[in-house]
């Protein structure tokens, strides 16, 4: 974890920081207040950080936060990865948005389907959807960190393109690489509560039975 005088990171952003490779230029997509960009530049972990946001207000806040780091941080206003040229940054962080939005951003930038890029993804919602999409589109999870921030569970994912597309099973989509991590039982309980609610609305049949089996498996994992 960084030790510079940049703003303190919450557990979610600290986990994202740790997945960024030292010595590589990074793009912070959805940089918001710029705290992660400041930490990456201020600690010397990245020689260049491209702080990017769709909205002028947050980008201006990021300019203020990152001002002490001069030209180590550059700023881009625009949507997703459209503000970058391929290869401009090889470590790409996308945080602060739901899984569907992250997927839309990646689908719109086919150049990230390349093993040179290190993706750090922090979905605010629907973690299982993102895990499924990554597997189907040929990305492998290289690491995953469970953490809590502002009372919510986050799964910070580190992914890289391999071209090995596969159909993941339901349990993998729900748990990824989180088994055995601190807090995983509580995380699984949250996932299971959503599954149980979903199952109540299903008619009797194969899907309802499959969801019931997943619920039982998550209960087993949560119990240790």
Question: What residue ranges belong to the model's regions?
Answer:
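S-adenosyl-L-methionine
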Residues: 1-24, 38, 60-86
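Class I S-adenosyl-L-methionine
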Residues: 2-12, 82-83, 88, 100-224
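Conserved class I S-adenosyl-L-methionine
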Residues: 23-32
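Short beta-strand element of Class I
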Residues: 47-52
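Conserved SAM/SAH-binding beta-strand->alpha-helix loop
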Residues: 55-56
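Short SAM/SAH-binding signature in class I
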Residues: 89-96
């Amino acid at each position: 974890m960084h030790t510079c005088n940049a703003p303190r990171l919450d557990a979610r952003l600290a986990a994202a920081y740790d997945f960024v490779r030292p010595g590589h230029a990074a793009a912070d997509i959805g940089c918001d207040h710029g705290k992660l960009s400041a930490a990456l530049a201020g600690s010397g972990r990245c020689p260049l950080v491209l702080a990017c946001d769709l909205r002028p207000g947050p980008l201006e806040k990021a300019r203020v936060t990152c001002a002490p780091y001069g030209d180590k941080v550059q700023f881009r206003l625009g949507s997703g990865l459209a503000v970058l040229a391929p290869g401009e940054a090889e470590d790409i962080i996308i945080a602060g948005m739901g899984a569907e939005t992250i997927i839309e951003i990646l689908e719109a930038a086919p150049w990230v389907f390349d093993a040179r890029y290190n993706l750090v993804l922090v979905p605010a919602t629907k973690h299982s959807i993102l895990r499924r999409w990554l597997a189907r589109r040929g990305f492998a999870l290289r690491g995953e960190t469970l953490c809590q921030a502002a009372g919510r569970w986050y799964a910070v994912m580190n992914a890289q393109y391999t071209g090995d597309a596969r159909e993941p099973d339901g349990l993998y989509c729900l748990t990824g690489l989180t088994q055995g991590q601190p807090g995983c039982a509580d995380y699984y309980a949250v996932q299971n509560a959503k599954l149980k609610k979903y199952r109540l609305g299903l008619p009797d049949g194969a899907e309802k039975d499959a969801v019931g089996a997943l619920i039982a498996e998550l209960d087993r994992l949560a119990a240790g």
